[in-house]
Amino acid sequence: MDLIDYDVCKGPLRNRITYVIPNHPYLSWTAFNSCELDVNLNELTEEMIADSGHLTSEDLFQTRGLKFYDDSLLWAVLVEKNSVSFKRRDKATMTLDGFLAFLQSLRFEECTSPFYRVLTKATALAHFTIAEYFVAGEKRDTLSSHFNRLMELLDSLFLQFFMLRNRCDSNILLSLFELLPNPKEIAGEVVAPSNLLLKNFLDDKIFFSFVMNYHFVVSNLCSCGECRKALFSRFLKRRERGVLHLSDIQDFSPQDLILQQLHLTNDEALRVRESIDKDLGAELILKAMESKTLPILHDEILGNSHLERNILKIYCNIILCLFLARRVRERISRDLDKIARFFAQSLVFLEIRILPFEGVENVCRKLAVLGSHFSSHNVMSIPRHCSAFLEVASILVASYSKQNHRVRALLEHLCQKKVALTCSCFLLHLARELRHDILEGFTNPLKLHYMDNPVRFFRCQDCNLYGTHLWSGLFPNVVPHAVRGGGSFEVRIFEHRMRQRRVSVRKRLFKESQHRGFTIRQSRRIPRLAFCPFAKPVHKDY
């Protein structure tokens, strides 16, 4: 057998052995040409049997035809992507290219038809797409969460940049801010974060305005030896007609941006470049947000004064975050385009294979509609289309009998309680650990909310990669210690004035509504008749 060691076997080799879970005759599994396991099935409690319905891919993710070994590997990958409790330590998460290669390496039972093999791969990719590219504030190791954090951090940095500008009295500093457009400022006011505002952060005008004016801004804000040397070398290059261009094309190397800019030393630039090459700076940004520090230049002493130092720090971090956000957006767009092409080809194959059967016209129609949706150029709606595909896939796999991998998972758990099962595959070891924790009650089983009620789930959660859920209040407060070190009083004064302005506006609107209501009531008031008492005329008899 491929799931256990021979230390837990008893008796001779037998041609056929059937294991039946007590009080659950439908949960049975037959092993051929194997020894009997020395386990007591009565040790399984009703809670274990109920939780075992979430421990295999065929039960939780509705896959069919996989061998138990490959089913366990796929379950470990998808559970790690979907759950917040199960996180791999000191390991890089699987990317889309790695997952597509993993799908091609999956092994199926010999009796599995090509139709269900393609359907299983498409179903697994749909679950991976929703877990990786759907915005959720709880997830940390996905591209959508990394993009979400970058947008939140940019919102905070642009707000701090606006506050620093209001503290400037020098015309030179104010002229520098005129070169750098702030998307947080609209008509002189700071607006609350919204989807439309966050999309403006990634505008080419914003990015190139910050990048192309870097040398001019740094030469005015910092007078250290490195900046003076760089300024002199650039002057010599200009005389030699050597112009440095910073472009944002697809094959642009991150080291050209990092090593020549952002006021970093060679060692710091090397670490930042390695972080970008590893995971597009996800670990760097997450560490900065958890510790409430700036991603780079947090403890550096630079600039001519305290105010100029803060301006330069926020300015360099804005450039880095803009660069990373644009890189992550391009990666997400390319990945979703690959997913769309995969589903378009798979749906055509499934539609052709299902056409000869009768009574499936409605399913064929749904597959054709989904194929047209995946062939469209709206890549940001791919996770929603994957949810619709899972609804159709649940209909197609309903007639395919399961192989009761959950019984083998329970047997493996009983064997694991007796002996330590060793394996060279990390994913299999991870699957066994997670199953053990769930069956022993240390962790709750995973539940897929987007499968229970997909319409309500996608309506409540925003699926356009801009629905941030990590803001605390109106303005995010991510980098308070880096900017407000020496200017806390001025910042508090500014915030107090902003609050007073909002209070005065509310009071004015309240008074106007009161006056309007009073006027309406006066106009609708019906005048009453005036009653005047008259004395009766006195008749005198003459």
Curated annotation (Swiss-Prot):
Family listed: Belongs to the herpesviridae U4 family.
Protein name (Swiss-Prot/TrEMBL): Protein U4
Species, as recorded: Human herpesvirus 7 (strain JI) (HHV-7)
Gene designation per UniProt: U4
